[in-house]
Curated annotation (Swiss-Prot):
Cellular compartment(s): Cytoplasm
Subunit structure: Monomer.
Protein name: Elongation factor Tu 1
Biological source species: Shewanella frigidimarina (strain NCIMB 400)
Major place of residence: cytoplasm
Function, in words: GTP hydrolase that promotes the GTP-dependent binding of aminoacyl-tRNA to the A-site of ribosomes during protein biosynthesis.
Region spans: G4: 136-139
A molecular function GO annotation: GTP binding
G2 as annotated region, ranges: 60-64
PROSITE patterns: G_TR_1 (PS00301), G_TR_2 (PS51722)
Amino acid sequence: MAKAKFERNKPHVNVGTIGHVDHGKTTLTAAISAVLSKTYGGEVKNFAQIDNAPEERERGITINTSHIEYDTPIRHYAHVDCPGHADYVKNMITGAAQMDGAILVVAATDGPMPQTREHILLSRQVGVPFIIVFMNKCDMVDDEELLELVEMEVRELLSEYDFPGDDLPVIQGSALKALEGQPEWEAKILELAEALDTYIPEPARDIDKPFLLPIEDVFSISGRGTVVTGRVERGIVRVSDEVEIVGVRPTTKTTCTGVEMFRKLLDEGRAGENCGVLLRGTKRDDVERGQVLAKPGSINPHTTFESEVYVLSKEEGGRHTPFFKGYRPQFFFRTTDVTGTIELPEGVEMVMPGDNIKMVVTLIYPIAMDDGLRFAIREGGRTVGAGVVAKIIA
């Protein structure tokens, strides 16, 4: 069977369902697939296909995730749904499924529950920029006032975590009734799709962001100078661009005098490409793996940050024992390990394998970082945790 060609003509947006267990995330995912494919064309995925989420491994962590795709007239969406709460935690922290926006599913029959709150907090910590609310099971609530009350509660909860609770879209619907084909409830799914189209802005493509290349290797070429190699993470570097070398040591400026790929000289290196960048007047010993090459002023080196961390379970190849304050592992950022110390939240004495935890990390030397940067925690080359920079402190 021939592979379907990927149509590039519509903007591509990544979304996902979040919310408390049994509030109807997977049913809603199936309803979106059914209603949108019926209305705008496309392949339908039923509940069983979505619910039977395949196991994936991201940095050694086992995550069950379902991926579906659907179209609206103006966009193409990739949507992730996870069967279990632990899968959401892992997914959001590792960035296995980066979300441009999330659909928070809240059952009108229950209102916000503990995992509702935890998923909102996680979204805030890992940098999910936009949330849309789908109040589900509204067909089971006869009382108009009760629906208003639940909506108010959800909006207040979102505001508590710095999302614009008063302004974001809340759609009242029933995923099950929409899935059964009842027109009044199908209309609510179309309303949700319209909210996705209008409320979540089109994400900036990697190529349009400021240039960044994590340095993997450094060579000196006699008569030409120093070449750094790596995969361009974002943006474009052109010959004669001024660039900064950031992290590990004090930041220095230099100029790109050449770009090479597969031994050919190019005018530019673009996001996603592996290339070598020739640097003017830079000595071989001035640069090392673990630094980044970046557009001047676009990224700064930092040592201390608040992070959200998932600690691998024993079954995932992680630690067999808890760790305590004073733990000093390596933190792997992009291409290199840096030793760091941790500070646990007040009242937390130890962290067990399989836990997720907020911690403040202080590295022994600075690394180029922004909020949202992912890292691994390692001991002697073995991954024992995954984390994300939630807030830079220093």
